[in-house]
């Protein structure tokens, strides 16, 4: 029998149970958020940062389509949609200088140091690289948040936005599973949020084993793993039950 999450009956709303690994999880869609992580040209489009840095982005198109499907279902169910855009100011002050680990580990910054002609083009606010892909367009009522590091909780109002709305369950999509998606979900776990990742609405940076490792970490230690079809089924009207 599916086990409800510990806060499943706290809101008295319409609840649904999502089949997931390692066990099902019950939540109120109207007290939950769908988080779309960094679906920018930088991460999902040929000619973007990841592509120029040597990562394979050739299989991101199905991920974009699956995110579209998940967003449509979530919006219809009354879930808050939050879009993240990763990047910095044009001078990269927000990226940090040599005294910041980000300066040394960000592949975007390292790529620009190797190819100075790309300076100001990768992950710079206002650039094509920074923009969300054409297929994914935020709608009125959605929230779009810039973030300067891998985790969407670092130096952003995400925690305040969620707490002020009574949101405890977060459903994750986006790129990269093993970097910004996992980092944000982990930080959410430490802040007492229930995190679910839709595996076919995410894509890794690196080899396929990076995707598998990230999903293993999430389902074993930090959250739950499901898929878009199952998520949409859980949000269909016949799946809801009222919990007083």
UniProtKB/Swiss-Prot annotation:
Q: Which family does it belong to?
A: Belongs to the isochorismatase family. RutB subfamily.
Q: Which Gene3D superfamilies match?
A: Isochorismatase-like
Protein name as annotated: Ureidoacrylate amidohydrolase RutB
Respond yes or no to whether keyword Hydrolase is given for this record: yes
Q: Which gene encodes it?
A: rutB
- Please give the function described in this protein's UniProt entry: Hydrolyzes ureidoacrylate to form aminoacrylate and carbamate. The carbamate hydrolyzes spontaneously, thereby releasing one of the nitrogen atoms of the pyrimidine ring as ammonia and one of its carbon atoms as CO2.
Which InterPro entries does the entry mention?
Isochorismatase-like_dom, Isochorismatase-like_hydrls, Isochorismatase-like_sf, RutB
Q: Which reaction does it catalyse?
A: (Z)-3-ureidoacrylate + H2O + H(+) = (Z)-3-aminoacrylate + NH4(+) + CO2; (Z)-3-ureidoacrylate + H2O = (Z)-3-aminoacrylate + carbamate + H(+); (Z)-2-methylureidoacrylate + H2O + H(+) = (Z)-2-methylaminoacrylate + NH4(+) + CO2
What taxonomic classification does the UniProt entry list for its organism? Bacteria, Pseudomonadati, Pseudomonadota, Gammaproteobacteria, Enterobacterales
Induction text = Up-regulated by the nitrogen regulatory protein C (NtrC also called GlnG) and repressed by RutR.
Query: What GO molecular function terms would the record report?
Result: hydrolase activity, acting on carbon-nitrogen (but not peptide) bonds, in linear amides
Q: Which domain of life is it from?
A: Bacteria
């Amino acid at each position: 029998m599916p086990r409800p999450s510990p806060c499943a009956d706290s809101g008295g709303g319409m609840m649904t149970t999502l089949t997931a690994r390692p066990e099902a999880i019950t939540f109120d869609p109207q007290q939950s958020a769908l988080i779309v992580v960094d679906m920018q040209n930088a991460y999902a489009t040929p000619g973007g940062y990841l592509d120029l840095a040597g990562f394979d982005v050739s299989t991101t198109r199905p991920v974009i389509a699956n995110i579209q499907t998940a967003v449509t279902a979530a919006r219809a169910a009354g879930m808050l949609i939050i879009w993240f855009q990763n990047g910095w100011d044009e001078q990269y002050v927000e990226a940090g200088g040599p005294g910041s680990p980000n300066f040394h580990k960000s592949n975007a910054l390292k790529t620009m140091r190797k190819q100075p002609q790309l300076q100001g083009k990768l992950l710079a606010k206002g650039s094509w690289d920074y923009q969300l892909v054409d297929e994914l367009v935020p709608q009125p009522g959605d929230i779009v948040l810039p973030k300067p590091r891998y985790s969407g909780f670092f130096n952003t109002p995400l925690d305040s936005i969620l707490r002020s709305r009574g949101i405890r369950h977060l459903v994750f999509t986006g790129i990269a599973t093993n970097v910004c998606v996992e980092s944000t979900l982990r930080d959410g776990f430490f802040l007492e949020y229930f995190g679910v990742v839709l595996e076919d609405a995410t894509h890794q940076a690196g080899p396929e084993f990076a995707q598998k490792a990230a999903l293993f970490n999430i389902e074993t230690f930090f959250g739950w793993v499901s898929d878009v079809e199952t998520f949409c089924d859980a949000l269909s009207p016949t799946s809801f039950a009222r919990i007083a």
